Amino acid sequence: ASRLLDQDRIDLVLCFAPSCQVVEGFRSTFAAVLGRRLDGQIGAVGAAYTYQAMEYRDEGFWQLLDDYRVLVVFDEIHHCAGHDPLLSNAWGQQILHRIQDRAAFTLALSGTPWRSDDKAIALARYSSPEGLLICDYRYGLKDAIADCVCRSPRIVLLDNQKVKLTEQLGADSSVKLFPSIAKLLGESPVTYEELLRHDEVINPILDLGCSKLNELRQIKPDAAGLVVATDIEHAQQIALALEAMGEDCRIVTNKTPDAQQVINAFRSSTCSWIIAVGMISEGTDIPRLQVCCYLSRIRTELHYRQVLGRVLRRTGESDVQAWLFMLAEPTLQR
């Protein structure tokens, strides 16, 4: 954007993102780099909005794309589906209808460039007949580690070679032994979500996370940990477990009043742990997060990668590794 402005190839910059956190990050980062505001007010170089806000922009707003040379930046573009307006989701339709052929330049970004429903991503190009995504530029984790932008991830899988399942049948009970968590989940009625709520699963994972975080805080005193919980009740259960271990923590969920303020306060504090339900995923920027305990029932590759990304951002010379602790569940292992 800075180069295009300096070369007099654009007049304005518009940014769109899936969440308010990322929008705020766009505004502050672009303002710092360009030396001009991105708040949409008079004198600003542009504006940043959520994808949801696109449908509430009036015709006068979209006329800017015809009257000026505009660079439009899309973050996490995989949220916007479709090449054909009839097969697109609501956000994809707005891009196809309002922006695609009117912007002077577009930059579409994604750390996870695919969709779980297998629909095409808006603005993306695909090979024929294979249907593989064609990227103009790839910057992977290996590149980011080499450039000292990201930490090298260390993933620890917790398993048990003697899982004991006691089944109560009236006055009688039976005990079955399983050689692994995978066998337990595949050959018994126990579900993965039930397992995640068991104290004998929660505590060992938290123990591993706390030990590693305490080790890291000897070098980097404000290093922090993230626990990804399944729901609010689960988050409260995890908070009690952490407090019993003598750890301080915060909970943030989609029901938390002023959730963004809670995240912002945690970002600049020295509190050790934050427990999240659906709030700290893609785009949330808390660089001091360096350890994650994954206790979410969601097992998609998309969600897993997004969560791992929360602990990868490097902030200095000493924080070269990030740690993720989780159960050895077959889908996650793949």
Q: How should each PLM-predicted stretch be described?
A:
Residues 248-334:
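Conserved RecA-like P-loop NTPase helicase motor core
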